Amino acid sequence: MACTGPSLSGAFDILGAAGQDKLLYLKHKLKTLRPGCRGAYLLHAMVLLKLGQETEARISLEALKADAVAQLVARQWAGVDSTETPEEPPDLSWAVARVYHLLTEEKLCPATMREEAYRAALRAFRSRDDLQLGELQEEARDRCGWDVLGDLGGVQTLRSDLGCLPPSSASLSRTRSDPRPIEHLSGWSTACSLRSTGSPASLGSNLEISQSPTMALLSVHHSHHGPSKLCDHPQASVVPEPAPMGCQEPEEMSWPPSVEAADSPVRPSSPGPGLPEVTTDACPASPHDPPEVPEISAHYPVECTDVPAAPKSLPSPSKNTCLVTDQTPVQLSEEDTAYLSAQPRPPTPSVPQTSPSFPSASTSPFPSPSTPPEAHPTPSKAHPTPPKAHSTPPKAHPTSPKAHPTSPKAHPTVWNPEPPPPELESSEQKFYNFVVLHASADEHIALRVRERLEALGVHDGATFCEDFQVPGRGELHCLQDALDHSAFIILLLTSNFDCRLSQHQTNQSLMSSLTRHGWQDCVIPFLPLESSLAQLSPSTSSLLTGLVLLDEHSKIFARKVTNTFKPQMLRARKAKWRKEQDARALREQSQQLESERQHAAAWGAAYSAYVHSYLAYQTQVEKLQVALANYMPFGTQLPFGGQGSLGTPPSSFPTLPGHQPPPLPPWLGGTPPPIFPQPPQTFPQPPPTFPQPPPTFQQPPPACPQPLDFSQAPPARPQSPGLQPLIIHHAQMVQLGVNNHMWNQRGTQAPEDNTRETE
C-alpha cells in the first residue's frame, strides 16, 4: 500500500505496485533520457532496486556521488555500508517532487500527489530562505500550474491598502501623482506580477489593478525576490494598464477602443479608491517614437519591474531543459527499440500549455470592444508592454517596423518561435558496438547476454533478432547489415547453434573479419551460462578452434569484457564505419549523377538531330520557292517571295476582273471551325488558292452566268502562310466551284494556237 505523503518510501511503494512489465519499460525508458531531465537517474536506480537488480542499482548510484539524495537511497535501500550517519539532504523534498513528477507522467500516481510534493518542497525552501527558491517556483509553476503557488503560507492576497500611503489629493484628471517609495514592506505581499484569478491572461501586461478591495488576486512569482520599488523615471515600454470603469467585470484591458471608457462615471456604491484616467492623443504615435507614460492618478503604489526599452515578445516561461517541459516525446535508444515495440507504450501525457498573453475574442473572459482595434488605433501611451519574466531578457522576435506599436497585430498572442524546418528522416543505419548472432531458439539467451554486457559498460549493443531481423526482408540481407554496422560479432555458442544457417553466419563473419580493412579479430565466440563446450557440435568446434572463447563461466569474465571492448577500439571502428558510409553515399550520388548525365546527353543528341532535320527542311523549302519563281508569270508576286521571309503571308492576291479578293475561311485564318455548319451569310467567294487568269482574259459574254458582285466585301482575315497559288497556262475556259456553286470564264485563243490550227 502506497504512502499517503510524498516521500522516497512512498515512491518505492508506488513502483512496487506498478508491476514487472511496467518496471521493465521504465528501466529502458529512463536509461535513455537526456541529462537535462533531473530526477530520471534517481528514479532509474529505484526501478532497478525494485526489479531486484541490486548490482546495477549500485553502479547507477555510484555514478551519482555528487547527489546527496542518491547516496541516501544507496545507504537505506541499496545496503551500501557507510560510517557516516544518514542525514536528510536539504534538497530532498525537491528530489522527491521530481520523482513524483516522473511517476505522474507515467500514469503511476495522480497529479494531486505531484502537486502536494511540490508544495512541500516550496514550504521547506521558503522556511529557510533558500537561494534556489526562485528556480523551484518556476519549475513548480511549469509542471503543476499556477495554483500550486497560490496557497503557500508566505504569499498573501494583494490588496490596495489606504493606510500605507497618504491618499492623493489629485482628482481624476490629466495630472499624474508623484511616485513615493514604499517604506514598510511588512504590510505588503511578496513582490510579484499581477494576474486575474484563475487565468494567467494578464501575463501580457505587467500590471493589473484589482476591481474591488474584496476581490483577491493570486500573487504569482514572476521575478527575483527583492524589495518592491517604484520606477524613478518612466520607462519606454513600461506602461500601467487602466482599471476597468464602473463595472464589476473587467473590460478589454489590452487595447481600449476609445477614451470613452476612461470617462465613464464611477459607481457611487463602490468603496474602492480613485481610479486612474488614461489620456490618448488624436494621432497615433509613430512606430519609431518611444511610448510615453500615461498621466494617471492613483491612491496606491504599484510594482514596476525592469523591462527593456524596446518592445519585445513574451519570453519562454521555463528555463528547465527537462524532456517533459519541451513537450517532445521521449526518444529511446536504438538498442531498446525492438523491446519497447513489443511492449504497449502508454500514451504521452498532456503538458500544461502556456496561456496566451492576450486572449482571443472566442476564449477571452473579457468582453470584446464593439469597434475593432484597426478602426480606432490607440496611441502608445495607453498600451502596456509585456514584462520581463527573468533577470536576463531572452531573445525576442524582431518586430516589423511597419506594424503600429499599439496594434494587436504587432504583438504575438503567444511567444511561439518559428518552428524549425522538419528534418528529413535519415535512412542511415545506427552503428552498434556489438551484435549477438544466435539461433532462432536462443532469443532469450541473446537478450540476457546483451543486457549483461551493457551492465558491464559496453553500451549500444544489439541482437540479431531484435535489431536486424526485419520481417519481410531477406535473411542474408539482414545478416550482411549486421556485419556492416557493428564493431564486434558475438557468436552465441549453444546446442542450437548447429544448423546450416548458423554455420553460414559463422563463415560470413569470419570472411568479413579477414577481408574488411580494420576489422581484424572482430568475431568473438561467446559461451553463455546455459551452455558448455561439450554441447557444441564438432563442426562448430573445429571451425572456431583458432579463436579464443569468451566464457561467461569464468571468474574473470568482467575483466575480459573490459579488455576486449576497449573504448579506443570502439571509437576507431566507428570512425572507419563512418568513412565507409560516406564513401558509399558518394558512390551512390556519383552513379545517380552519371545516370542523369547520360539521360541529358541522350536528350541533347535527339534535339540536335531534330534541329538538323528542321534546317534541312527549311533549305529544301527555300529551293522550291526559287524554282517556283522561275515559272511564275511576269509581274505576279510570290506569296513566299524572296523579299519576305519563310512563313510570311503574301501581301496581295491577283483578283478576277471586277471582283473583290475573297476572304480566307475561318479555319484557315486561325479561327477554329464551328461545331455545327452555319449557313453562309453572303455568297461565297473563291478561295485565294485558286489560280487567277492571266491579264489577256476577256470578260465573259452577258449570256454567261456571272457571279454576284458584292458591293461590300467582308474584311480580309490574316492569310495563312501555307497556301500556294495554282498557275494554269493555255486554257480557253476556267471553271471555279465553291460551296456547290460553279461559274466559268472564257478567254481568247492564244496566237500560237491559231497558227498551229492554220497549219
UniProtKB/Swiss-Prot annotation:
The keyword Ubl conjugation applies. There is a cross-link at K229 (Glycyl lysine isopeptide (Lys-Gly) (interchain with G-Cter in ubiquitin)). Residues 241-296, 340-426, 642-723 are annotated as: Disordered. A motif (pLxIS motif) lies at residues 207-210. Keywords: Antiviral defense, Apoptosis, Cytoplasm, Cytoplasmic vesicle, Immunity, Inflammatory response, Innate immunity, Isopeptide bond, Mitochondrion, Phosphoprotein, Ubl conjugation. Residues 351-365 have a biased composition (Low complexity). Phosphorylated by TBK1. Following activation, phosphorylated by TBK1 at Ser-210 in the pLxIS motif. The phosphorylated pLxIS motif constitutes an IRF3-binding motif, leading to recruitment of the transcription factor IRF3 to induce type-I interferons and other cytokines. It comes from the Eukaryota. Residues 430-590 form the TIR domain. One of its GO terms (biological process) is response to exogenous dsRNA. Pfam families: RHIM (PF12721), TRIF-NTD (PF17798). InterPro entries: RHIM, TCAM1/2, TICAM1, TIR_dom, Toll_tir_struct_dom_sf, TRIF_N. Residues 1-153 are annotated as: TRIF-NTD. Residues 366-376, 659-705 have a biased composition (Pro residues). Residues 549-759 are annotated as: Sufficient to induce apoptosis. GO terms for cellular component: autophagosome; cytosol; endosome; mitochondrion. It is found in: Cytoplasmic vesicle, Autophagosome; Cytoplasm, Cytosol; Mitochondrion. The keyword Phosphoprotein applies. GO terms for molecular function: signaling adaptor activity. A motif (TRAF6-binding) lies at residues 84-91, 248-255, 299-309. Gene3D superfamilies: 1.25.40.780, Toll/interleukin-1 receptor homology (TIR) domain. The modification Phosphoserine is found at S210. Involved in innate immunity against invading pathogens. Adapter used by TLR3, TLR4 (through TICAM2) and TLR5 to mediate NF-kappa-B and interferon-regulatory factor (IRF) activation, and to induce apoptosis. Ligand binding to these receptors results in TRIF recruitment through its TIR domain. Distinct protein-interaction motifs allow recruitment of the effector proteins TBK1, TRAF6 and RIPK1, which in turn, lead to the activation of transcription factors IRF3 and IRF7, NF-kappa-B and FADD respectively. Homodimer. Found in a multi-helicase-TICAM1 complex at least composed of DHX36, DDX1, DDX21 and TICAM1; this complex exists in resting cells with or without poly(I:C) RNA ligand stimulation. Interacts (via TIR domain) with DDX21 (via C-terminus). Interacts (via TIR domain) with DHX36 (via C-terminus). Interacts with AZI2 and IRF7. Interacts with TICAM2 in TLR4 recruitment. Interaction with PIAS4 inhibits the TICAM1-induced NF-kappa-B, IRF and IFNB1 activation. Interacts with IKBKB and IKBKE. Interaction with SARM1 blocks TICAM1-dependent transcription factor activation. Interacts with TRAF3. The pLxIS motif constitutes an IRF3-binding motif: following phosphorylation by TBK1, the phosphorylated pLxIS motif of TICAM1 recruits IRF3. IRF3 is then phosphorylated and activated by TBK1 to induce type-I interferons and other cytokines. This is TIR domain-containing adapter molecule 1. The lineage of its organism: Eukaryota, Metazoa, Chordata, Craniata, Vertebrata.
